[in-house]
Amino acid sequence: MLSLGVNIDHIATLRQARRTVEPDPVAAAVIAELAGADGITVHLREDRRHIQDRDVRLLRQTVRTHLNLEMAATEEMVAIALEVKPDYVTLVPERREEITTEGGLDVAGQVSRLRDVVGQLQGSGIPVSLFIDPDPTQIAAAAQVGARWVELHTGRYAEASSAAQRQVELDHLEKASQQALQLGLRVNAGHGLTYWNVGPVARIPGMEELNIGHSIISRAVLVGLDRAVREMRQAMGLS
């Protein structure tokens, strides 16, 4: 069944803009869950630009749905994940100069290293998802390294400049989902999804979870977080 993972990074972005204590992502996670979020997602970046170590540790204690920790495949982040033990980890690419994650992880180009990281995490009981572009080579590599999930990068779909191009990108996502399922992978998706473009992605066969942050938090500024989460669930066709 399709579910909604709410990414609360930008609650922390607002807090860090003033280097203060509010708004608190931990409190936001509680509100999101009460409004119907099926999971909470946070990205602990190496530069700590928004989510902080404190947030991850407190969220592990307070989240009642599931906690998805997005992180780079570095020794530091693996050590934190092994300590905190989120419900699952999503490995993502990371560059300090980027505003947000700009593309999928190049799994095919680092199979040996990622196999080791995935094995270390999953050997400790932490399932691993890989954030990848909807590319056949990357999907095959994700299966090769032993990941449980792939999260398909929906950025090109979200940024398509015409209906025709959007349909092309949607077709790529559908084919990628089908390939992943055939290889025994579970399928999530995210990046750039909004209230206005989420519907077709939500209807892709086999899709398990959509991770959405910026659109929900942007709307929450105007209507409140509870309503913003509920409206996203409606846009996804969830009750």
From Swiss-Prot:
Sorted UniProt keywords: Cytoplasm, Pyridoxine biosynthesis, Transferase
Family recorded in the similarity comment: Belongs to the PNP synthase family.
Superkingdom of origin organism: Bacteria
Residue sites binding 1-deoxy-D-xylulose 5-phosphate per the record: D9, H10, R45, H50, T100
Enzyme class: transferase
GO BP field: pyridoxine biosynthetic process
Enzyme Commission designation: 2.6.99.2
Protein name: Pyridoxine 5'-phosphate synthase
A Gene Ontology cellular-component term: cytosol
Cell location: Cytoplasm
Record-annotated site: Transition state stabilizer: E151
Gene3D superfamilies on file: Aldolase class I
Catalytic activity: 3-amino-2-oxopropyl phosphate + 1-deoxy-D-xylulose 5-phosphate = pyridoxine 5'-phosphate + phosphate + 2 H2O + H(+)
Residues involved in 3-amino-2-oxopropyl phosphate binding: N7, R18, G192, G213, H214
Active-site residue numbers: H43, E70, H191
Function noted in UniProt: Catalyzes the complicated ring closure reaction between the two acyclic compounds 1-deoxy-D-xylulose-5-phosphate (DXP) and 3-amino-2-oxopropyl phosphate (1-amino-acetone-3-phosphate or AAP) to form pyridoxine 5'-phosphate (PNP) and inorganic phosphate.
